[in-house]
Amino acid sequence: MANRKYFGTDGVRGKVGSYPITPDFALKLGWAAGKVLASQGSKMVLIGKDTRISGYMLESALEAGLAAAGLSAAFTGPMPTPAIAYLTRTFRAEAGIVISASHNPYYDNGIKFFSAKGTKLPDEIEEAIEAMLEQPMDCVESAELGKASRINDAAGRYIEFCKGTFPAHLGLEGYKIVVDCANGATYHIAPNVLRELGAEVIEIGTDPNGLNINEKCGATDVTALQAKVVETKADVGLAYDGDGDRIMMVDHLGNKVDGDQILFIIAREALRSGQLKGGVVGTLMSNMSLEIALKMLGVPFLRANVGDRYVLEKMLENDWTLGGENSGHIIIADKNTTGDGIVASLAVLAAMAQHKLSLNELASAVKLFPQVLINVRFAGGENPLESDAVKSVAAEVEKRLEGKGRILLRKSGTEPLIRVMVECQDAELAQQCAEEIAEAVKKIN
């Protein structure tokens, strides 16, 4: 893949008002994407967003650029990222655009594209858009300008899609569920899905004002959800992130159930029903206990680099349909083409309803090993992980942990940091080993 100036692993992202998340760049990006897509015969693009106040500005700029290139835009309003992937397919749109910075604060935003199939744009299309961004803007003839329209029933369509992934012979009657929508894009979707399946729903994080997305709520901070589940004696709590592609859960005792445990529950249920295709893809950060639990079921497990994009790539390489991250990105490829928080949570709720078991009981098969993470700042220049001294200490630690844990040493891609992660059943040993490696890295500085 060629070096990109604008597109990262998850589209274009940054702080609002700072290049490239500016109205003039969004206008140019809309035009460039429009020119490239129009050359492929495209006529219409879907545009969705989360609840950030900057979404209004960016969607208007994108639409103007697309129109200048001769493409029409259909707005969905605030919708989860996976909903745009789904609607792009069902509307037969040539592409979908999502304006979101996912789990980031309100002052960040981003723009990413889906193909007509609801997957990431092919590399060659992204590269063509990047090349077009270097060209001066022009405008098609007046009669060929694009139009703008609104899809008024977008939410209803996606609600029906989500409900359709839940087994028809099961319901959620008798379940009390607390749902935290992070004041984000699922605020008008998830509560309705759950109610229509029969659950009693208590809502938090469903009052977006443009500035409170992901603020002390949602999948990245389940503290409020844990308290509400215990206070209301609910059966389960669900926390989505700002754009609805992540899920974290809380059991009836207030314990957090993370992406690794959720992935295991879904995998075991798929195995029992004969629907598991191949194995499961996790990441370098997936807890060792997940790997061990899957091994006990005879389920193959592979690790991808961190990032849902890389998880999906490895799934496609192996023709598997299930993968995810401990952060709560869960991809069930036979249901949607991208991580879908609502769909993943429904898969877990279906397992609870099917077996009359609590989330606590279902998650107990994966007793997460303690993870110790130490970030060590270095002066830049040579990578400390290439040092013989660090390699020697790391090798000695690995020998001590053999069979009981593992280490992961990574150089940050964005900062001069070495990330030292040690995972072990024995928390004290994990801490001790992490400190030894971190000390060796510091000495190189």
UniProtKB/Swiss-Prot annotation:
- UniProt entry keywords in alphabetical sequence: Isomerase, Magnesium, Metal-binding, Phosphoprotein
Residue ranges that the Swiss-Prot or TrEMBL entry lists as coiled coil: none
Q: How is it modified after translation?
A: Activated by phosphorylation.
Reported cofactor(s): Mg(2+)
Q: Which SUPFAM superfamilies match?
A: Phosphoglucomutase, C-terminal domain, Phosphoglucomutase, first 3 domains
Residues of the active site: S102 (phosphoserine intermediate)
Instruction: Tell me its family.
Output: Belongs to the phosphohexose mutase family.
Protein name (database record):
Phosphoglucosamine mutase
Q: Where does this protein come from, organism-wise?
A: Haemophilus influenzae (strain 86-028NP)
Primary gene name: glmM
